[in-house]
């Protein structure tokens, strides 16, 4: 850590693989049990454990009976062969919890708002590094210490992911934090680094403008004048209620959004095309509109917008008639089925839907589910062109396992002149906080206030009752 170098994760995995602990969580075996199993079989990866099972070696391990062997076999059949990372939501929560327990700051991939993290990183300023490392080793969430030096240690968490802590002198905390935050490419371009107590001082001593952690992926990156912040959002334009697959009523969602400081909230429940959840037809939307009107009378000046997440049909038409959509304040369009269609076909369907004059935003354009489903084949260059022609904003969806558009695609969209809508896609009052992840993703892509539709006031979005049609 003093030199900016990080021990390769695969070196740690030869001693003890996080995969085994993660598998244990799947099959209901504790971390210590899985660690002992790994040591007894001399295996450190899921694939090695799979081989041991096929060779019949598990039966020789004390305490592994037929029932446990069957559970492990079932878990291995379900276990993904590709390496999984922690989502940004989970990596931030775990990093923050560990940091709070140690009086430290979290760094690494979590601090850079990476969509997936494969290692956590902490930095603690102290004059007693040994005591800090002892405290780290005793944390209930650290199941094993893999490596320990005079001022750093690497442990394995109950999540099956390595966590690295670096103890440094208070006067060099800023330097240590920057190195631990990374990326290695970004930091290497700044070396040699002066000692500094905080990052602001460090950048000043380097003669550079401060670079937010989210942008520290490539060497030489400089920040735009003002990245968008959570406080810049004036409303959330995508959430669900008990009218479809949500768990909060219109009133409950509105009250929670107001508590977060929003000025408005668009209710965007599903249409019937999404057959796996209840969908709203024309009369349902009108009845919901009556309920929204009552909530608005109660909560004014806070505004609940009549919206919909309108599914895109296989032929590119929308799953609601134009006269119904014309009554609404905000229309999100989205594709749920048919994500694996060929590139040209998929792009034609989505762009045709975007040309509907009532469409205002396109939800989760690339259709991915982190760790589970890859992006679809949608041609983003063509999508951007149609977005420019129609004025449809592209969503940065804040659901923890979506974050779609990704930060990389946000950067591409901004370069093309596209505007974004940062949404929670909340299905509960708690889910409204997802917008923080949308903001983090947009920031990582370089988005500023002017790039984001919902930094505007409600009057700029809705010009009259039922004013959801584009200009």
Predicted regions and their residues:
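Short linear capping/connector segments at secondary-structure termini
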Residues: 14-18, 271-273, 309, 368
